[in-house]
UniProtKB/Swiss-Prot annotation:
Mostly expressed in germinating seeds and young seedlings. Detected at low levels in roots, stems, leaves and flowers. ATP binds at I20, G21, E22, G23, T24, F25, A26, K27, V28, K43. The lineage of its organism: Eukaryota, Viridiplantae, Streptophyta, Embryophyta, Tracheophyta. Residues 337-366 are annotated as: PPI. This is CBL-interacting serine/threonine-protein kinase 3. SUPFAM superfamilies: Protein kinase-like (PK-like). Its cofactor is Mn(2+). Residues 14-269 form the Protein kinase domain. Involved in the resistance to some abiotic stresses (e.g. high salt, hyperosmotic stress) in young seedlings, by regulating the expression of several stress-inducible genes (cold- and salt-induced genes but not drought-responsive genes). Required for the ABA response during germination. CIPK serine-threonine protein kinases interact with CBL proteins. Binding of a CBL protein to the regulatory NAF domain of CIPK protein lead to the activation of the kinase in a calcium-dependent manner. The CBL9/CIPK3 complex acts in the regulation of abscisic acid response in seed germination. It comes from Arabidopsis thaliana. Interacts with CBL3 and CBL9. Keywords: ATP-binding, Kinase, Manganese, Nucleotide-binding, Serine/threonine-protein kinase, Transferase. It holds the Pfam family NAF. Residues 307-331 form the NAF domain.
Length: 441
């Protein structure tokens, strides 16, 4: 097998891999603890940007609080590190994808299933609120599923990355995706984080049960008006109890909007409700956080880049495949999440050309480097420009696996893009039948 050279990156004891998410202030990469082998998510912040926007103290405060929160439905924050130029937040790595993907793939949920996810969501939100931590940006991308199908809320407590506290002492935000955002947030006159989170939970519940958004319009001003009025229609298949609860939550007046405590007493919510039982540990060691924000030289971690050959072996292929089922790697019709894989025939350079030929007519700019490609849609969608990252791995001399992942933008747009891309590459897709023929030889 021809092995190409690839630069491997290391931060402290963590081996850093592919990018799995990207935002204005942060990039998230897959990483692995070299001492334990445990996979983690590594959120990388640029120190200069943090200081420029005067967010250091607020981020320090929220990270310190999040380190104390150990809730089964909240992505856990393990530790914080820093180099001379970057801040690294080590988070639990969640493997089940976004809750939104489940709706896209399977459609709306039955009430019992939706209720279970909503119960987990409300308990976690209320728990964090009770400790003074608010999300303020609850949306499908932040609602993940673990390998057991349990809800995990990500980015809880890291809202300082997109929120600003002004002189009036209230929170202010400029929101790029308003569908899940409370009316008072859109008005930008300041708002309470707890009631704003509650509204977002109501929109999430509606989407789980209906399969579509309660407030939607291609015209942004019309969308703002719909949200501000709080007028929406419930689909006829919803039970009366579900309709009543959604109506109480999607109250445009934050002063009369239902609270988590009132939701806990709601009859529809209480059905089959079992609050999670978990141990609240007192992890009060904040030395790593203090060191990061005091620029302590002795606690700075080193970033290393080392040249070494990258080969994808059988174990890696199996570990990348859901349910240890290799058929998913060779099936272009597979269900997928924020990232997916497709196996193609031909040489690596030939495959790069074919992906470029397929992406450009779809309106994407293409950047290439070291068998990796970055595709950016020049036309902004609902959530800004869709950015897609691809990386090519060699399985055999004329057989390559291409990993396709969303690094920025709307998940639904990514799903549509992937289907168009895989259709364009149909002639070179290595199908499941070919795998079986090869195996039978």
């Amino acid at each position: 097998m021809n092995r190409r050279q690839q630069v491997k990156r290391r931060v402290g004891k963590y081996e850093v891999g592919r990018t799995i998410g990207e935002g204005t202030f942060a990039k998230v990469k897959f990483a692995r603890n070299s001492e334990t082998g445990e996979p983690v998510a590594l959120k990388i912040l640029d120190k200069e940007k943090v200081l420029k926007h005067k967010m250091a103290e607020q981020i320090r405060r929220e990270i310190a609080t999040m380190k104390l929160i150990k809730h089964p439905n909240v992505v856990q924050l393990y530790e914080v590190m820093a180099s001379k130029t970057k801040i690294f937040i080590i988070l639990e790595y969640v493997t089940g994808g976004e809750l939104f993907d489940k709706i896209v793939n399977d459609g709306r949920m039955k009430e019992d299933e939706a209720r279970r996810y909503f119960q987990q969501l409300i308990h976690a939100v209320d728990y964090c609120h009770s400790r003074g931590v608010y999300h303020r940006d609850l949306k499908p991308e932040n609602l993940l599923l673990d390998s057991y199908g349990n809800l995990k809320i990500s980015d809880f407590g890291l809202s300082a990355l997109s929120q600003q506290v002004r002189d009036d002492g209230l929170l202010h935000t400029s929101c790029g995706t308003p569908n899940y955002v409370a009316p008072e947030v859109l008005n930008d006159r300041g708002y309470d984080g707890a009631t704003a989170d509650m509204w977002s939970c109501g929109v999430v519940l509606y989407v789980l049960l209906a399969g579509y958004l309660p407030f939607d319009d291609s015209n942004l001003m019309n969308l703002y008006k719909k949200i501000s009025s709080g007028e929406f229609n419930c689909p006829p298949w919803l039970s009366l109890g579900a309709m009543k609860l959604i109506t109480r939550i999607l109250d445009p007046n934050p002063m009369t909007r239902v609270t988590p405590q009132e939701v806990f007493e709601d009859e529809w919510f209480k059905k089959d409700y079992k609050p999670p039982v978990f141990e609240e540990r007192d992890d009060s060691n904040m030395d790593d956080i203090d060191a990061v924000f005091k620029d302590s030289e002795e606690h700075l971690v080193t970033e290393k880049r080392e040249e070494q050959p990258a080969a994808i072996n059988a174990f890696e292929i199996i570990s990348m495949s859901r349910g240890l089922n290799l058929e998913n790697l060779f099936d272009p019709e597979q269900e997928f999440k924020r990232e997916t894989r497709i196996t193609l025939r031909g040489g690596a350079n030939e495959i790069i050309e074919k992906i470029e030929e397929a992406a450009k007519p779809l309106g994407f700019d293409v950047q290439k480097k070291n068998y990796k490609m970055r595709l950016e849609n020049v036309k902004a969608g609902r959530k800004g420009n869709l950015n897609v990252a691809t990386e090519i791995f060699q399985v055999a001399p004329s057989l390559h696996m291409v990993q396709v992942s969303k690094s920025k933008g709307d998940t639904l747009e990514f799903h549509k893009f992937y289907k168009k891309l895989s259709n364009s590459l149909e002639q070179v897709v290595w199908t499941n039948n070919e795998v079986k023929k090869e195996t039978a030889k």
